[in-house]
UniProtKB/Swiss-Prot annotation:
The EC number(s) this enzyme carries: 1.8.4.11
Pfam families assigned: PMSR
The keyword Oxidoreductase appears for this protein: yes
Keyword vocabulary terms for this entry: Oxidoreductase
Catalytic activity: L-methionyl-[protein] + [thioredoxin]-disulfide + H2O = L-methionyl-(S)-S-oxide-[protein] + [thioredoxin]-dithiol; [thioredoxin]-disulfide + L-methionine + H2O = L-methionine (S)-S-oxide + [thioredoxin]-dithiol
GO molecular-function terms, A-Z: L-methionine:thioredoxin-disulfide S-oxidoreductase activity; peptide-methionine (S)-S-oxide reductase activity
Protein function: Has an important function as a repair enzyme for proteins that have been inactivated by oxidation. Catalyzes the reversible oxidation-reduction of methionine sulfoxide in proteins to methionine.
Gene3D superfamilies the record matches: Peptide methionine sulphoxide reductase MsrA
Protein's organism: Chromobacterium violaceum (strain ATCC 12472 / DSM 30191 / JCM 1249 / CCUG 213 / NBRC 12614 / NCIMB 9131 / NCTC 9757 / MK)
Residue numbers annotated as active site: 10
Name of the protein: Peptide methionine sulfoxide reductase MsrA
GO biological process: protein modification process
């Protein structure tokens, strides 16, 4: 089992998206990249801790590789807006790849360069690519949020359309 740590706006969106993929065994919402030892949601949302909302993905590289995870990552959020995803604004919503080794770093740089060269987006990608500091799991009520709260407005208006996009574009990667 390998791990990936990605931030692309609200972690509820990424958790719901990656949980649907074949080869993904576990997705944990959490915080990464800040300067406090034990961040909580309030500190992260205030911007005071410097952390980014992220997901830690545990995956089987024999079933899905890191580059494919990144393709899905770039499809489900806007990597061209600095510290913002839709109405979610602040450094905690940064687009970020926290790599765990040099292979992940090189893969991330290669995928970004390819997407920029192909002009997939209307603006350059501003995703941070940084060595992963300590990952901090978020509070329990953030885990599996979409699965437990599908009728909430945020889930219906923000997360569900992203999941529909994944079903259309990456149907071959979905769990049965």
């Amino acid at each position: 089992m390998e791990k990936a740590i990605l931030g692309g706006g609200c972690f509820w969106c990424l958790e719901a998206a990656f949980s649907q993929l074949k080869g993904v065994e576990r997705v944990v919402s959490g915080y990464c990249g800040g300067h406090t030892d034990s961040p909580d949601y309030r500190q992260v949302c205030s911007g005071d801790s410097g952390h980014v909302e992220v997901v830690e993905i545990s995956y089987d590289p024999a079933l899905i590789d890191y580059a494919t995870l990144l393709q899905v990552f770039f499809a489900v959020h806007d990597p061209t807006t600095l510290n913002r995803q839709g109405h979610d604004v602040g450094t905690q919503y940064a687009s970020a790849i926290f790599y765990l080794d040099e292979t992940q770093r090189e893969c991330a740089r290669r995928v970004i360069a390819q997407l920029d060269a192909e002009q997939i987006f209307d603006a350059p990608i501003v995703t941070r690519v940084e060595s992963a500091p300590r990952f901090h799991p978020a509070e329990d009520y953030h885990q599996n949020y979409y699965a437990q709260n599908q009728q909430q407005n945020y889930c219906q208006l923000v997360i569900s359309p992203k999941l529909a996009k994944i079903r259309r574009r990456f149907s071959h990667l979905l769990q049965n």
